[in-house]
Amino acid sequence: MIDQKVIVALDYDNQADALAFVDRIDPASCRLKVGKEMFTLFGPDFVRELHKRGFSVFLDLKFHDIPNTCSKAVRAAAELGVWMVNVHASGGERMMTASREILEPYGKDRPLLIGVTVLTSMEQSDLAGIGLNVEPQEQVIRLATLTKNSGLDGVVCSAQESSLLKNELGKEFKLITPGIRPAGSDQGDQRRIMTPVDAIQAGSDYLVIGRPITQATDPAAVLKSINDSLASK
């Protein structure tokens, strides 16, 4: 099977609406991301419903806690059968290492474990507000390096950082990029954005795209257009 590059970010407060959307798209064309709001509203059974429909799921809960608690949450995600799960890299090396080690018994069936560096909504002024007097890019590199040194599979990062991180951390280290908007789309609340083709060419491995697909009149056609544009490069 072709490794789908597109991860569709589901953003619904009604489960029936979410499943109605999901039933309009093909699991061969994308993966799905379930975040904090939907998981809190609908729980693990919603993820199981997506699995029944053939979709791989990125469980985007950004765990950040003491090592024991965080690693057990990661293990629970593995038990649920998700394809990818993430933790905040700012939780530190011990937390990330514990989370990686708890997945080792799952072997090839374990989910990808990804670190979150700097949220794409954050600018330098936001970092300064929490006591970090650094450029976002500098903090991203610092946390991404810590993530790799902790043995994780990759990081979430903006497309602007992808090229630098690929060069710094190697081709095998996966880069998952939100803030992706197909040409002509509304910027939304993401500050650091890029088109799908630009992001892949910059070094991103997977692209998180939400409203341009979920709010489209024909989401399957939008997905096909994005995938075709990526296949032609």
Swiss-Prot record:
InterPro entries: Aldolase_TIM, OMPdecase, OMPdecase_AS, OMPdecase_bac, OMPdeCOase_dom, RibuloseP-bd_barrel. One of its GO terms (molecular function) is orotidine-5'-phosphate decarboxylase activity. The keyword Nucleotide-binding does not apply. Substrate binds at residues 11, 33, 60-69, 120, 181, 190, 210-211. SUPFAM superfamilies: Ribulose-phoshate binding barrel (SSF51366). The active site is at K62 (proton donor). Gene3D superfamilies: Aldolase class I (3.20.20.70). It catalyses: orotidine 5'-phosphate + H(+) = UMP + CO2. Belongs to the OMP decarboxylase family. Type 1 subfamily. Catalyzes the decarboxylation of orotidine 5'-monophosphate (OMP) to uridine 5'-monophosphate (UMP). Homodimer. This is Orotidine 5'-phosphate decarboxylase. It comes from Vibrio parahaemolyticus serotype O3:K6 (strain RIMD 2210633).
